[in-house]
């Protein structure tokens, strides 16, 4: 084998090892992102909701700072109920569609998928209704979320 071929093979192996260390994106969270965009008709990027208030994003504690943060708290609680039913809400895929007046779950027969889809659709619609206060994005949760 030629030295150049060995270098190419080594580069491919190193690339594959690097790719293997990237954690997979939970499918449901990708779907939830699409539901949010459907509900708010693309008026606000999904990432605006990932670090908002005390409950939007990973985890949550304390008193919600406003209506939008209460939507996130309700969504967190809904996922908690799904987990009590033995469901894996961040990993479940489900069938939905985006209509003119927002997202809907589509003919879901399996209990876990239906429950999680309902959690996500209700949260997305709640996000669309609630005012967004820029001052509540990226707050110091250690101070404000006791």
From Swiss-Prot:
Pfam families cross-referenced by the UniProt entry: Phospholip_A2_1
Instruction: Using the record, list the residue span of the signal peptide; answer none if the entry has no such feature.
Output: 1-19
Q: Which domain of life is it from?
A: Eukaryota
Q: What is its EC number?
A: 3.1.1.4
* Chief place of localization: secreted
How the cofactor binds, per note?
Answer: Binds 1 Ca(2+) ion.
Q: Which GO terms describe its cellular component?
A: extracellular region
Expressing tissues? Expressed by the venom gland.
Catalytic residues (positions): 75, 120
Name the cofactor(s) required for activity, per the record. Ca(2+)
Disulfide bond annotation, renumbered to this chain: 38-98, 54-145, 56-72, 71-126, 78-119, 87-112, 105-117
For this UniProt entry, the molecular function terms from Gene Ontology, in alphabetical order, are:
calcium ion binding; calcium-dependent phospholipase A2 activity; phospholipid binding; toxin activity
Keyword annotations for this protein, in alphabetical order, are:
Calcium, Disulfide bond, Hemostasis impairing toxin, Hydrolase, Lipid degradation, Lipid metabolism, Metal-binding, Platelet aggregation inhibiting toxin, Secreted, Signal, Toxin
Which compartment or compartments is the protein found in? Answer: Secreted
Could you tell me which SMART domains the record lists for this protein? PA2c
Q: So where does Ca(2+) get bound?
A: 55, 57, 59, 76
Q: Which GO terms describe its biological process?
A: arachidonate secretion; lipid catabolic process; phospholipid metabolic process
Broadest EC class assigned to this enzyme: hydrolase
Q: Which residues form the propeptide?
A: 20-27
What does the record give as the reaction this protein catalyses? a 1,2-diacyl-sn-glycero-3-phosphocholine + H2O = a 1-acyl-sn-glycero-3-phosphocholine + a fatty acid + H(+)
Q: What is stated as this protein's family in its record?
A: Belongs to the phospholipase A2 family. Group I subfamily. D49 sub-subfamily.
Q: What does this protein do?
A: Snake venom phospholipase A2 (PLA2) that inhibits collagen-induced platelet aggregation. PLA2 catalyzes the calcium-dependent hydrolysis of the 2-acyl groups in 3-sn-phosphoglycerides.
Query: Which PANTHER family does the annotation name?
Result: PHOSPHOLIPASE A2, PHOSPHOLIPASE A2 FAMILY MEMBER
Would you tell me the protein name for this molecule?
Acidic phospholipase A2 S14-72F
Q: Which organism is it from?
A: Austrelaps superbus
Upper lineage is: Eukaryota, Metazoa, Chordata, Craniata, Vertebrata
């Amino acid at each position: 084998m030629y030295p150049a071929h060995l270098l190419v093979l080594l580069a491919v192996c190193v690339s594959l090892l690097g790719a293997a260390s990237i954690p997979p994106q939970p499918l449901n969270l990708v779907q939830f992102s699409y539901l949010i965009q459907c509900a708010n008709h693309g008026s606000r990027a999904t990432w605006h909701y990932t670090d908002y208030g005390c409950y939007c994003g990973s985890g949550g504690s304390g008193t919600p700072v406003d209506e939008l943060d209460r939507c996130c708290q309700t969504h967190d609680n809904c996922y908690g109920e799904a987990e009590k039913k033995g469901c894996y809400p961040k990993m479940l895929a489900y069938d939905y569609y985006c209509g003119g007046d927002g997202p809907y779950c589509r003919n879901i027969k399996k209990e876990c998928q239906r429950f999680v889809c309902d959690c996500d659709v209700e949260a997305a619609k709640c996000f669309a209704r609630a005012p967004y206060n820029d001052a509540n994005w990226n707050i110091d949760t250690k101070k404000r979320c006791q």
